Amino acid sequence: MPPRRNTRKAATKLRSSCAAASTLDLVGDKWSLLVVRDLLHGKRTYGEILRSPEGIPTNILADRLARLEQVGIIESAAYQERPVRYAYTLTPKGRDLGDVVLALVRWGKKHIPGTRSLTEK
């Protein structure tokens, strides 16, 4: 399989040395933690993540996958040659965000009526 080419900048610019601000610089946009959530719940491919109920636009999903890979939160491996398609998995650094996602779920269930976790039907 051909290697995945990363055409993005080598580093993400951080606003300050504050750990909270720096973390938000990496994953604080509207979509990144939802991609992490989907990977935590077993989704692996672009198409699987794209079908999530929030309706992430295709260009945004491609950008977030590339950015999360660039900062070491996810990694990709080609599973098909023509056309080349990738499966995504969380790195140990990415799996460490599981507690953050869980904290958001707990907060939402407590403070936003009608919300639930993905595992609840």
Over which residues does each language-model region extend?
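N-terminal helix-turn-helix DNA-binding core of bacterial DNA-binding proteins
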Residues: 18-60, 81, 89
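Basic, amphipathic "hinge/linker" alpha-helix immediately C-terminal to the N-terminal HTH DNA-binding motif
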Residues: 28, 80-103
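N-terminal leader segment of winged-helix/HTH proteins
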Residues: 1-27
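Basic amphipathic alpha-helical segments that dock to polyanions
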Residues: 61-71
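Short loop/turn motifs at secondary-structure junctions and domain boundaries
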Residues: 14, 79-80
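Amphipathic alpha-helical dimerization/coiled-coil segments
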Residues: 98-121
